[in-house]
Amino acid sequence: MEGLRPSDRLLSLLLTVGGLSLVLAQSECNCSSVSPGVLAGIVLGDLMLTLLIALAVYYLGRLVPRGRGATEVTRKQHIPETESPYQELQGQRTDVYSDLNTQRPYYK
């Protein structure tokens, strides 16, 4: 194991520990074992089925029009505009703030 990289060492350690637990589990029970080919087929089938479901949901989601966005746009177009409760700006009015225009010595 001197020529192995750290990742290879970790992989070999995990495979060894996993293999030992598999042997111990088989010796303790009378269960039928699953071959690695069957296990790989189950995992790949599950991945393919998951991908197929995700793609079907994506494409069906694109076919269905968006319910909320479409109704909000049409609803907003039918609402008549109301007058603004705010007063329009009239420009600068010096008479309103003329009494504040005094200069105090501590602001200089």
Swiss-Prot record:
PANTHER family: TYRO PROTEIN TYROSINE KINASE-BINDING PROTEIN. Gene3D superfamilies: YojJ-like. It comes from the Eukaryota. Belongs to the TYROBP family. Its main location: membrane. It is a single-pass type I membrane protein. Homodimer; disulfide-linked. Homotrimer; disulfide-linked. Homotetramer; disulfide-linked. Homotrimers and homotetramers form when low levels of partner receptors are available and is competitive with assembly with interacting receptors. They may represent alternative oligomerization states or may be intermediates in the receptor assembly process. Binding of a metal cation aids in homooligomerization through coordination of the metal ion by the subunits of the oligomer. Interacts with TREM1. Interacts with TREM2. Interacts with CLECSF5. Interacts with CD300LB and CD300C2. Adapter protein which non-covalently associates with activating receptors found on the surface of a variety of immune cells to mediate signaling and cell activation following ligand binding by the receptors. TYROBP is tyrosine-phosphorylated in the ITAM domain following ligand binding by the associated receptors which leads to activation of additional tyrosine kinases and subsequent cell activation. Also has an inhibitory role in some cells. Non-covalently associates with activating receptors of the CD300 family to mediate cell activation. This is TYRO protein tyrosine kinase-binding protein. The gene is TYROBP. Residues 71-108 are annotated as: Disordered.
